[in-house]
């Protein structure tokens, strides 16, 4: 089992999760495949990806796969709840993107409207960044 140093901070009514930079997506993926009792061949075959690409992902030579492929991976792995968020967070960090689960959730137009109603655009446009300070 991969041990990941996670630190939670409670500030201004919200939890902030800090992920230890030493853990990589490729390490987590390898551990999750092992925990699911899948062989590498069975995993990449079921996923429909080529062997060289899979081993490039597993070695960390390439960035984690795109969001749709991440979701397909998780369907095969049947992960624990805490592994799901870590999986998406690590992939997003290495891809320099918003985590796939959050990006998919933001496809809900009603939720986007609610989020935008909560944004202080004056602060955002003035400072160039926005930190929710509730």
What are these regions (language model features)?
Residues 2-38, 125-130:
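A short, Lys/Arg-rich alpha-helix, primarily the initiator
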Residues 33, 58, 69:
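DNA major-groove recognition helix of helix-turn-helix
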Residues 35, 46, 76:
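Residues within the alpha-helical elements of helix-turn-helix
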Residues 40-45:
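Short alpha-helical "recognition helix" segments of helix-turn-helix
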Residues 67-85:
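DNA major-groove recognition helix of helix-turn-helix/homeodomain DNA-binding modules
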Residues 85-120:
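Short, charged recognition helix plus adjacent turn
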């Amino acid at each position: 089992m991969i041990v990941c140093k996670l630190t939670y901070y409670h500030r201004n009514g919200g939890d902030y999760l800090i992920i230890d930079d030493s853990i990589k997506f490729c390490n987590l993926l390898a551990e999750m495949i092992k925990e699911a009792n899948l062989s590498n061949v069975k995993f990449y075959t079921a996923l429909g990806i080529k062997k060289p690409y899979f081993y490039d992902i597993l070695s960390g030579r390439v960035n984690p796969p795109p969001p749709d492929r991440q979701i397909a991976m998780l369907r095969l792995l049947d992960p624990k709840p805490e592994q799901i968020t870590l999986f998406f967070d690590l992939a997003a960090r290495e891809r320099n993107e918003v985590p796939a689960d959050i990006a998919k959730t933001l496809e809900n137009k009603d939720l986007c409207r609610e989020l935008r109603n909560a944004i202080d655009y004056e602060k955002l446009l003035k400072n160039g960044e926005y930190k929710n300070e509730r």
